[in-house]
A protein has these predicted regions:
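Long, solvent-exposed, polar/charged low-complexity segments
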Residues: 1-24, 45-48, 136, 155-235
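Soluble, non-transmembrane alpha-helical interaction regions
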Residues: 8-10, 74, 143-148
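Glycine-rich, often proline-containing surface loops adjacent to acidic residues and nearby aromatics
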Residues: 32-33, 111-117, 187-196
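Short histidine-centered catalytic/ligand-binding loop motif
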Residues: 34-41, 130-135, 203-207
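Hydrophobic/aromatic-rich structural module bridging two neighboring secondary-structure elements via a short loop
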Residues: 58-104, 108
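Compact, glycine/acidic-enriched structural inserts
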Residues: 109-174
Length: 235
């Protein structure tokens, strides 16, 4: 089935710009890049977002906020230090909460390429504790969800503690024999699929199709995290 798409694909220009922001992650470089930030990054990402809405959210009648504050910011909230990120990401969220306080199906563009995945943690402290409770109450079910993806290439499962220079990560790229010890003390849990820069460019507009396939892959785990003790899920 052909998707209704307005996104035309990422261009080499966006990755070259993000390369420069990675090399000089500061507001001065951001200001130099402002035209490209709009034309090469933000506007195409909005069209990509619109395609997800038209082809996934609306047909499935999903109760997601798709307009307000679904995108991250390039400029860091670092108390005036002027730092700048080298990536931009987005996630829809349930209307009664906020993007950073919900379980997130994330879409991320960076100098390395594009990534789609699932994250719980950071400001979503209550949902992280709920997810951990679900994991340890049904470890076999959890491993089934995770390993189904880890058996394929370019999927990574990792936990993290801390942030910035103090962040530590425990990373797995192959099926797990047991729930990692790092899960219990984790401040965030990721399951993410990476698409290389070269493949992202080659996909063009079809990145939307690939991304939706990946969304469907993580959807059972998204529901697992949000299910209550009786296994019931709802938005």
């Amino acid at each position: 089935e052909t998707l209704d798409r307005s996104f035309e694909g990422w261009t080499p220009a966006v990755f070259e710009m993000l390369d420069r922001l990675r090399a000089e992650p500061h507001i001065d470089q951001y200001n130099k890049e402002k035209p490209g930030v709009t034309d090469d990054l933000k506007d195409p990402f909005r069209r990509y977002r619109d395609d997800l809405v038209v082809n996934w959210v609306l047909p499935n009648r999903l109760n997601f906020e798709t307009e307000k504050h679904v995108f991250s910011r390039l400029l860091k909230n670092d108390f005036g230090a002027g730092g700048c990120h080298d990536h931009l990401w987005m996630s829809f969220y349930r209307p009664h909460t906020r993007r950073l306080e919900d379980v997130q199906i994330t879409h991320r563009v960076s100098p390395d390429g594009f990534a789609v995945g699932l994250y719980v943690g950071a400001y979503a402290t209550e949902l992280l504790q709920q997810a951990k409770a679900r994991i340890f109450a049904a470890p076999a079910t959890y491993l089934d969800h995770v390993n189904r993806l880890l058996q394929d290439d370019d999927w990574y499962f990792y936990t993290h503690r801390g942030s910035g220079e103090n962040e530590t990560r425990t990373v797995f790229d192959a099926p797990l024999d047991e729930v990692p010890e790092s899960v219990e003390g984790a401040e965030g849990i990721y399951l993410r699929h990476y698409i290389s820069r070269e493949e992202t460019l080659a996909l063009g507009a079809a990145l939307v199709d690939r991304a939706l396939d990946l969304v469907f892959e993580v959807w059972p785990l998204y529901r697992f995290y949000l299910a209550d003790r009786d296994g019931q899920w709802g938005q």
